Amino acid sequence: MEVISTNTNGSTIFKNGAIPMNGYQNGTSKHQNGHQNGTSEHRNGHQNGISEHQNGHKNGTSEHQNGHQNGTSEQQNGTISHDNGNELQLLGSSNSIKPGWFSEFSALWPGEAFSLKVEKLLFQGKSDYQDVMLFESATYGKVLTLDGAIQHTENGGFPYTEMIVHLPLGSIPNPKKVLIIGGGIGFTLFEMLRYPSIEKIDIVEIDDVVVDVSRKFFPYLAANFNDPRVTLVLGDGAAFVKAAQAGYYDAIIVDSSDPIGPAKDLFERPFFEAVAKALRPGGVVCTQAESIWLHMHIIKQIIANCRQVFKGSVNYAWTTVPTYPTGVIGYMLCSTEGPEVDFKNPINPIDKETTQVKSKLAPLKFYNSDIHKAAFILPSFARSMIES
């Protein structure tokens, strides 16, 4: 594995055995604004609903009420201090904090929120780009949040990852060179390695803290960064694509944040033009494209931009993810002019035999050829707006 770093930060050891993170300290590090184009796998623009994490009751009588010390934790001046020395900043508004729960709020889904019960806080810190937190949940295993938004759950995020990889790669024959923008935790790479035809994978992740969290808490994923076919680049994904060799990649996967704030450029015409230039004739791109229940106005704008750039085909697909807002997420799938790409009928499906025999990975949990085809069947209200 080749690692190319554009970061120049120092190194600091965290309290309580937390991983070294380039000058960050749990809950107290300076958070520098001015994110570069959202290349890490996260959704921006959310308020942090950081919940109080209770690290074990004493003799069945511990209870935290009205900010009073109960022997196990103390809440003062916007922080929660625990026996083990961890200190959580309460980054959300006071009414978003529920004992033992994490809650996700955003202006993108006003009037609703999603909450998970916290069993154990594993890591919290601030990088140069975002707040990073990992906790063990009661229902979905490890949960990664960036800027207060759930990015991936260990036991519930596989539909998103399998679909963002296999919808595009299952639609072209023998993909060899692939670029992932974002994906620093490693789930997307894990799925991509199912394809024996792949010879080269470039991963561009802006936030080295995300990669460090993967190495510490997801070693089975981080191990794939050492695959000889993989090059991990720590830097700006949009700049990387712009500088890429013309016609180099068979596929580009944009595992990015929401199209607001620092990630806004990743959904606009100049970025798509750079992507199209970096793809071979008949090459494909797949990017996260929001929820039809909340963001039809955003989806319509993304489609309009893609139709101006990609002269092959432009398609919208969707799937279900239990821990994302409204329980669904969408994808834009586009191809460049050249050999025809029919996204709705996979020609390179990853079935159980391929998975078990060739890639030596566990069988897929969500994706199959029927799910692939069904992903492009839209409800009437969405279809009429998208096809107009």
Swiss-Prot record:
Pathway: Alkaloid biosynthesis; nicotine biosynthesis. GO terms for molecular function: putrescine N-methyltransferase activity; spermidine synthase activity. Mainly expressed in roots. Keywords: Alkaloid metabolism, Methyltransferase, Polyamine biosynthesis, S-adenosyl-L-methionine, Transferase. One of its GO terms (cellular component) is cytosol. Residues 1-14, 23-39, 46-88 have a biased composition (Polar residues). The active site is at 255 (proton acceptor). This is Putrescine N-methyltransferase 3. It comes from Nicotiana attenuata (Coyote tobacco).
